[in-house]
Each structure stands twice: as structure tokens, then as C-alpha cells.
């Protein structure tokens, strides 16, 4: 079942140009090395997304405990474990792309005083490179209802696995 959830998350394969916003220094590094690096997400702009994920899990588990779940201690242990794994455990690496090459929000983040670039990449090439490195390409989920639904599915599945032991 976790494979089905994962497959669904990564099933929306990009077909249009993907854009990577960076600084001129980043551009020079990419051109000189002919390599696009994935960075540790804890040190990127996106690090808040990890904390947000942990917060959503905490809310879901707290709601279950408040509703009178039969094993609150076990749920709290799961919460501690998953929070640690998300914030301190696995090293997660990411390279960020957008489907729009001209977004004001991205220019503000990457072009201090107008000194940034938006590099367009063929999505087939990005997918090929990701597959060679055992990376997965997927869209960020920004819709809060979709985020909560996904968290609920994962907690349900993990609870099912834990409670069978």
C-alpha cells in the first residue's frame, strides 16, 4: 500500500520545460562543472517544508489521541520517531525546479538586485539524470487539504503495520 501512495506521488511526469532559478555564481558553477547538484534540504529555502510535514503529522496524531485512541503511548512513540527521522534522521537532497521560467517570487528569492538566472531543462533529461542517481522526481503538494489527506493515509498505513506486531 505504501508503494501505491509513493507511485501516485511520483506519477505526474513533467512534459514541459523545467526551470531552475539560481544566482550568477550558481550558473557559473553549473556551466564550469556541467553538473547540477542536489542539495541537503536542511540548508535550502525548502527546509521549512520538512518542519511543516512534521507539524502535520503531529496534528494528525494529536487529534487521534484527543479522540480517544486506544494506544496513545504508542502513537506518541511513533510521533517522536517520525519527527526525528524527518528533522534529524535521513539526509534528504533536492534540486528545485518550476514549470514557469518567469515567476516574481522566484526572482525575488534568487536575483538579488536583478542578478539571477532561470535555466530551462528538458524534463526527459532531468528524469534520466534523476533515475541514474536513484532520485525521484515529483511535484510539491501545496494544497493543504491534499497534504492532510496524504498524512492521514500514511499514518493509517503505519498504524496498521505497527498494530499487527
Give the ranges of each region predicted by the language model.
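Partner-binding and oligomerization surfaces adjacent to conserved cores of proteins
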Residues: 1-165
Amino acid at each position: 500500500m505504501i508503494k501505491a501512495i509513493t507511485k501516485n506521488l511520483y506519477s505526474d511526469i513533467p512534459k514541459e520545460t523545467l526551470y531552475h532559478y539560481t544566482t550568477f555564481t550558481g550558473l557559473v558553477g553549473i556551466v564550469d562543472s556541467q553538473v547540477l547538484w542536489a542539495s541537503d534540504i536542511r540548508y535550502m529555502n525548502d527546509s521549512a517544508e520538512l518542519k511543516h510535514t512534521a507539524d502535520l503529522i503531529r496534528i494528525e496524531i494529536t487529534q487521534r489521541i484527543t479522540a480517544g485512541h486506544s494506544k496513545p503511548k504508542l502513537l506518541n512513540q511513533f510521533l517522536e520517531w517520525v519527527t526525528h527521522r524527518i528533522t534529524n534522521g535521513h539526509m534528504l537532497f533536492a534540486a528545485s525546479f518550476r514549470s514557469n521560467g518567469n515567476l516574481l517570487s522566484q526572482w525575488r528569492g534568487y536575483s538579488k538586485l536583478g542578478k539571477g538566472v532561470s535555466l530551462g531543462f528538458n524534463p526527459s533529461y532531468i528524469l534520466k539524470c534523476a533515475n541514474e542517481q536513484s532520485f525521484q522526481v515529483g511535484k510539491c503538494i501545496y494544497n493543504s487539504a491534499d497534504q492532510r489527506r496524504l498524512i492521514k493515509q500514511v499514518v493509517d498505513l503505519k498504524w496498521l503495520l505497527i498494530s499487527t506486531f
